[in-house]
Regions:
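A translation/RNA-centric and nucleic-acid-associated enzymatic feature enriched
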Residues: 24-117, 134-135, 139-245
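Flexible helix-coil linker/hinge segments at domain or subdomain boundaries
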Residues: 116-126
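Short linear capping/connector segments at secondary-structure termini
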Residues: 128-133
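Extended, charge-rich, solvent-exposed interface segments
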Residues: 1-16, 21-30
């Protein structure tokens, strides 16, 4: 099934004119994610190197170099904890498209998942390891992080749009977090508190395929700003059965 899934991913990418590349595994600077890297040493050049934690930076160089649609299916390494959902060595699928937006990429991801399910199982309904069935078919739900958090709290949470439109204050968000018993980081800002509060209400409760979109700018500073909403970026995460894919 794994080989069928990988073949299906490659076919769907090819159908959308994406070019597959292989980027370096050994890197002088680890980046593209917040994770602890494995380190090694290249004797030939007396050089300390890192096993990559993500291919993002090199894939984005491909975009800058003129490859408008690019993807990679390959191994990444993160020297962190191990559990049922995390491994120190794992296969990642990562893709980038120029002249698109988060709507076009969202539609692509939906097709990638549905095509893979069809090619492996012959249906959008897949059989999981515990024997239960899960349906990837039909329309997928989309929710806004700020709108859904406001609904859960019973009050409007406003994005931080800058000095002229500061939105809901860090102090007020902190008070809400303390009241709910939500853990807080040592370094706090509006965006981090919004995400922590949202995760408290929703993260493990989104069973059906759901795109969560419009994140705070503070937690995703390199993402394109929202076209109409100050303080928000055009980013989504996909949740399935309570897990972020």
């Amino acid at each position: 099934n794994r080989s069928k899934a990988v073949a299906s991913l490659r076919k769907t990418f090819a159908d959308h004119d994406f070019l597959e590349v292989e980027t370096p595994m050994l890197q002088t600077v680890h980046g593209g994610a917040a994770a602890r890297p494995f380190t090694t040493h290249m004797n030939a050049f007396d050089l300390d190197l890192y096993l990559r934690i993500a291919p993002e930076l090199f894939l984005k160089r491909c975009l800058v170099g003129g490859i408008d649609r690019v993807f990679e299916i390959n191994r990444d390494f993160r020297n962190e904890g191990v559990d049922a959902t995390h491994a120190p060595e794992f296969t990642m699928v990562e893709a980038y498209q120029a002249y698109g937006n988060y709507d076009t990429i969202g539609a692509l991801v939906k097709q990638l998942v549905q095509d893979t399910a069809m090619d492996v199982f012959g249906s959008h309904k897949v059989t999981l390891l515990d024997g239960t069935e899960y349906d990837f078919g039909g329309e997928w739900k989309t929710i806004s992080m700020y709108d859904s958090l406001s609904e859960a709290l019973g009050e409007e949470i406003v994005p931080n749009g800058g000095p002229d439109n500061p939105g809901t204050s860090v102090e007020h968000l902190g008070e809400i977090a303390d009241k709910l018993g939500v853990e807080r980081d040592d370094v706090e800002n509006h965006g981090k508190l919004v995400e922590h509060l949202w995760e408290h209400f929703y993260e493990d409760k989104l069973y059906e395929p759901t795109f969560v979109r419009d994140f705070p700018v503070e937690t995703s500073p390199l993402v394109k700003g929202h076209r109409t909403k100050p303080g928000v970026v055009e980013k989504w995460d996909l949740y399935v059965r309570g897990f972020e894919l």
